[in-house]
UniProtKB/Swiss-Prot annotation:
This is Respiratory supercomplex factor 1, mitochondrial. Residues 86-144 form a coiled coil. Associates with the respiratory chain complex III/complex IV supercomplex. Cytochrome c oxidase subunit which plays a role in assembly of respiratory supercomplexes. Signal peptide: none annotated. Keywords: Coiled coil, Membrane, Mitochondrion, Transmembrane, Transmembrane helix. GO terms for biological process: mitochondrial respirasome assembly. Belongs to the RCF1 family. The chain crosses the membrane at residues 33-50, 69-86. Disulfide bonds: none annotated. The keyword Coiled coil applies.
């Protein structure tokens, strides 16, 4: 049996590979850069609202609360639009991850079965050796007796 991997429908897609959490994070930011921008805008508006509240500037406070709402709306829009735009790719990635998990599970199962077969063979060999030794002992006893 050769060690070459079986062909896969994911071979044509080099972006499908096992990735670390950091790689996934950077990939997702690259795929949907508007979401972090929305988070940043919302956070900045909240920070400015906090500063305005501490300074007692109610006009700026209300303006920043409105900016926070706009930041939330922008972020929500980016999430929904990105979900629609990248929906098919996410389904493919989930299929790939499921196939990868099944492959890993099958490899574990195959390794376990191989180990059981090796142990079974060792046990049979031991029994055959033991039976041969026992027969040789009986024959030696017959010759002596």
């Amino acid at each position: 049996m050769s060690n070459t991997p079986l062909p896969s429908s994911f071979d044509a897609h080099p972006e499908f590979f096992q990735e670390t959490k950091w790689q996934k994070f950077t990939r997702r930011i690259k795929e949907e850069p508007l979401i972090p921008i929305g988070y940043a805008a919302t956070s900045y508006a909240l920070w400015r609202a906090y500063k305005s509240m501490k300074a007692g500037d109610s006009v700026e406070l209300n303006r920043m609360f409105r900016a926070r709402i706009y930041g939330h709306a922008f972020t929500l829009f980016a999430i929904v639009a990105g979900g629609i735009y990248y929906g098919q790719e996410r389904r493919q990635r989930k299929e790939f991850e499921k196939a990868l998990q099944q492959k890993q599970d099958q490899e574990k199962r195959d390794a376990w079965l191989k180990e059981l077969e090796i142990r079974d063979k060792e046990d049979k060999d031991w029994r055959q050796r033991h039976a041969a030794i026992e027969m040789a002992a009986k024959e030696a006893e017959k010759k002596r007796g």
